[in-house]
Amino acid sequence: MTNNDAAVEAPSSSRASSSKQQPKLEITEKVRVLCLHGYRQDGDAFKNKLGSFRKFTSKYAEFVFISAPHIAAPLESAAEPVPEQRSWWANKDDGTFKGTNKGGPAFGFQDSLRLVEEAWKTQGPFQGLLGFSQGACFVGLICGLAKKKLTSIRPEFAVLSSGFVSGSLVHMSAYEEPVSIPTLHIYGSSDEIIPKDMSALLASHFKNVEVLEHGGGHYFPATAQQKQTYINFFQDRLQEYLEHLELQQSSSVSFIESGAEDNDDDGDANDAEVAAATAAAGSDLDDSD
């Protein structure tokens, strides 16, 4: 929760029992987004890289960054691993990862999925996911798994920058059903690490898609050219979230009022039963005289 959180109390019902208290719904004034970094990054590095982006959208969204559980294999076999260089999974037999690799394994993927599920549960609530490169690939997989109810994560929207479809065979089933949540797909026309066609292919697996293509390479753009797109996207997501909470609150109030009416009906029935019993008793007394 942010410091801007506010509690909204449901309107009281004159028919509700005084012993019953109306529920309180906490309205989060910003949507909360769990962020997944790229290969050989970590949560802190990714957070720093998204400084301008976070500033653009700070009115509407709060971003939480976590780090992958695996240390990436060193670039050279004789080199020492760098703790700050993290990996969500490896898709090559030598323990490294390459986005363009096809048909390889997914070493460590389940560990990473459990970590993200735990973060979603313990650091939430969250409404959305955001990822860059391998992290965006991961976000796409999570959305597909959520569609099939194969993960406890339930994103309401997602942002995928320089994303791609995983080539690992064990991931193929995650792309079997199109995903309907709103998504923003960001990619560069000059990206040589993840060519834009790969990112466009990932976008094709979603139904409610907005695409932001920039003229650069493999990075998350955050200049004045992209600012309004980001603001509009998160403004819409916040509006949807608040409307959902308003509907939820309305349903809760209706449920309580319905319960109060049932109690009143029960009371009326009891009164009728008492009156009938009293009348019957009086009749018996008259007969005995």
UniProtKB/Swiss-Prot annotation:
<feature type="compositionally biased region" description="Acidic residues">
    <location>
        <begin position="259"/>
        <end position="271"/>
    </location>
</feature>
<protein>
    <recommendedName>
        <fullName>Esterase GA18864</fullName>
        <ecNumber>3.1.2.-</ecNumber>
    </recommendedName>
</protein>
<feature type="region of interest" description="Disordered">
    <location>
        <begin position="253"/>
        <end position="289"/>
    </location>
</feature>
<feature type="active site" description="Charge relay system">
    <location>
        <position position="218"/>
    </location>
</feature>
<feature type="active site" description="Charge relay system">
    <location>
        <position position="133"/>
    </location>
</feature>
<keyword id="KW-0378">Hydrolase</keyword>
<feature type="active site" description="Charge relay system">
    <location>
        <position position="191"/>
    </location>
</feature>
<comment type="similarity">
    <text>Belongs to the LovG family.</text>
</comment>
<dbReference type="InterPro" id="IPR005645">
    <property type="entry name" value="FSH-like_dom"/>
</dbReference>
<dbReference type="Pfam" id="PF03959">
    <property type="entry name" value="FSH1"/>
</dbReference>
<feature type="compositionally biased region" description="Low complexity">
    <location>
        <begin position="1"/>
        <end position="19"/>
    </location>
</feature>
<feature type="compositionally biased region" description="Low complexity">
    <location>
        <begin position="272"/>
        <end position="283"/>
    </location>
</feature>
<dbReference type="InterPro" id="IPR050593">
    <property type="entry name" value="LovG"/>
</dbReference>
<dbReference type="GO" id="GO:0005737">
    <property type="term" value="C:cytoplasm"/>
</dbReference>
<dbReference type="GO" id="GO:0005634">
    <property type="term" value="C:nucleus"/>
</dbReference>
<dbReference type="GO" id="GO:0032526">
    <property type="term" value="P:response to retinoic acid"/>
</dbReference>
<dbReference type="GO" id="GO:0016787">
    <property type="term" value="F:hydrolase activity"/>
</dbReference>
<feature type="region of interest" description="Disordered">
    <location>
        <begin position="1"/>
        <end position="24"/>
    </location>
</feature>
<dbReference type="InterPro" id="IPR029058">
    <property type="entry name" value="AB_hydrolase_fold"/>
</dbReference>
